[in-house]
């Protein structure tokens, strides 16, 4: 939209953005529908050059990644064992972030400081070993060390998630370059990673679209988890005939599987 506005206003396009501007002009004449006027009006019609991010829309800002979000490291959960008579909560480590809760998952007491408790929809980022960032959808748990819970009081969840994900490949390369036993990043790498922050009006308009979209994506992941658990619970019972299908036990003998002869 900024390129479109600049072209419409006759403002200069930076050389670095010339190819993109040409594509926008071609798209506008061939098939693309322009944004509604009220949305286009939210965007500037000029660019300004910055040392850290190159050309950005005029009036927008640049901040460090750890200025737009709080990256809270987890606990050494072995110091918080399950208490007598308590079922406890799963300990969320890198393995759980990557593969989910399993029988091998450790457990810790639920009586940890509230900020270390994880709920569905929280954004988790493993900063050591296998670097991953994703919304958590495996139910309540306790955040282990080597994982960040990513939150923000000032910016939407989708904004901090997408910008963390945007820098993920750079973080992975940093961790790989300095790996000894287990590669990792440090907090100063979060400070070095920069974020382009749009105007409040643009951010608000984007949030009205992307906020519900992200919540829908998380909801779909939760539904997939529920269906997976249902499948895992029912399949063994179906195979043994303990559960019937349309009122009949599922047959698994050789006669059932034998092809009919013509």
Describe every region a protein language model picked out.
Residues 55-56, 147-157, 173, 188-216:
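Proline-centric
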Residues 70-73, 96-99, 130-132, 155, ...:
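Short, glycine-/Ser/Thr-/acidic-enriched flexible segments
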Residues 37-76, 200-205, 211-247, 252, ...:
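Non-catalytic DNA-recognition/assembly elements of restriction-modification systems
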Residues 2, 6, 10, 72-76, ...:
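A generic secondary-structure signal for well-formed alpha-helical elements
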Residues 93-94, 113-170, 174-180, 186-187:
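A short beta-sheet element
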Residues 45-51, 66-81, 88-120, 143:
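Sequence-specific dsDNA recognition surfaces
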